[in-house]
């Protein structure tokens, strides 16, 4: 939804947009111009199916090789990867002299897990690896502390690197995020 909302704003402002899927064999759309191409944006994104772990830098590199001129890059991700992985990817974008925005999208469940106390079997959505975990109040606090540290580290890296950054938790009003938060961080005027 975030990608579609941003595409709409860009197209409504008489600019053009190109969508890239960052995954193994991830494709790219053609450049879309004008609001009437929103259906094409929707169809392109609707056809995408997540598949496996992401090597951010390698995936970006493939798309950047075809870049003809500098512009704006908006990277939408959960950024739930090691700091070195997202830093390498974002630095690659910086090397291409792009105006970069990093939009971290998390679900409310990722921010505030509501698991019942007890034994859990968690399945990684990217690797399909299952781990057994004992969940309780202490584990919840530790998880939230680690996530907050990870997010702060990402935000700090972006700030120090001149990258626009914002966190969007998906139970928040998307219109408010796109039309109030993103202009406030300098993404749109």
Descriptions of predicted regions:
Residues 1-189:
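Exposed, interaction-prone extracellular/peripheral surfaces
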């Amino acid at each position: 939804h975030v990608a579609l909302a941003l595409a709409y704003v860009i197209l409504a402002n008489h600019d053009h947009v190109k969508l890239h899927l960052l995954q193994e064999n991830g494709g790219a759309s053609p450049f879309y111009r004008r609001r009437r191409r929103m259906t094409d944006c929707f169809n392109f994104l609707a056809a995408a199916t997540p598949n496996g772990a992401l090597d951010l830098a390698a995936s970006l590199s493939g798309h950047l090789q075809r870049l003809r001129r500098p512009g704006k890059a908006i990277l939408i991700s959960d950024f739930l990867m090691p700091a070195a992985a997202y830093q390498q990817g974002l630095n690659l974008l910086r090397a291409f002299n792009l105006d970069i925005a990093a939009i971290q999208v998390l679900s409310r469940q990722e921010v505030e897990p509501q698991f019942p106390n007890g034994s859990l079997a968690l399945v990684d959505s990217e690797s399909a690896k299952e781990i057994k975990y004992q969940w309780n109040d202490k584990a919840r606090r530790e998880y939230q502390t680690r996530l907050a540290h990870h997010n702060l580290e990402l935000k700090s890296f972006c700030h120090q690197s001149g990258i626009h950054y914002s966190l969007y938790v998906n139970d928040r009003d998307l219109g408010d995020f796109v039309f109030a938060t993103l202009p406030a961080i300098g993404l749109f005027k």
